[in-house]
Amino acid sequence: MSASPHIIALAAAALLAACGPAPASSDAPGEATPPAPESPAAATDAPATPTAVQTAAPAPQAAYDWYGRINDEERSRSMVLAYEVPETDDQPFNLSCEEGGERIFAGVPGADPAVQSIRLESSAGSKTFPVKTSEADELNGGRYLTVEIPGGDSVLAGFRQSGWLRVTAGAINHAMAAHGDRGAPQTINRFMAFCND
């Protein structure tokens, strides 16, 4: 399944930017937040542990699913795992990594410029991560935001096991569940292995 070159370019650019030297004042990923929902524009500056999941797993959406693409045209191979409608530009969320890099970058398009953190939730709990890069999103408007997540993070481990993930970035809130009969769970598992093994 192919996604818009614009989306892929943004994901690749964010991945390359994130791989460069971090600013001296950069916060560590996976910073802690209290269990209460964060303000849409609130930044998170203190490390936090996952909070208990308060809501049930979401149901799969008919048109959407998780699709993976490997880019082996560069010196180091990378992979994108996108939640999207195939053959369209409708891709509200993606994960990307370099092979064996043990760090994963989550990308959210069309976000409010004031958003400074992204919250992820899976069957293992939830965490809030500070925004690492923010770029103009010409396709969706607003900003294309990325956060960096350790490859072995417990929220991602829960996603790998259950096949669902929720993302909150200001007013943006997506509940994203894999279709078990389309091969998406296997794609998710393959992505996580690609990033961490």
Where are these regions (language model features)?
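Internal interaction segment
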Residues: 21-22, 126, 131-197
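Sec-dependent bacterial lipoprotein signal peptides
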Residues: 1-18
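Phosphate/adenylate-binding glycine loop and adjacent helical scaffold
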Residues: 27-37
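Mid-length scaffold segments of soluble, non-membrane domains
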Residues: 97-141
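Bacterial lipoprotein signal-peptidase II cleavage site
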Residues: 20-28
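Extended Gly/Ser/Thr-rich low-complexity repeat segments
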Residues: 91-99, 118-123, 157-164
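An ectodomain-focused feature that recognizes extracytoplasmic/extracellular
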Residues: 38-113
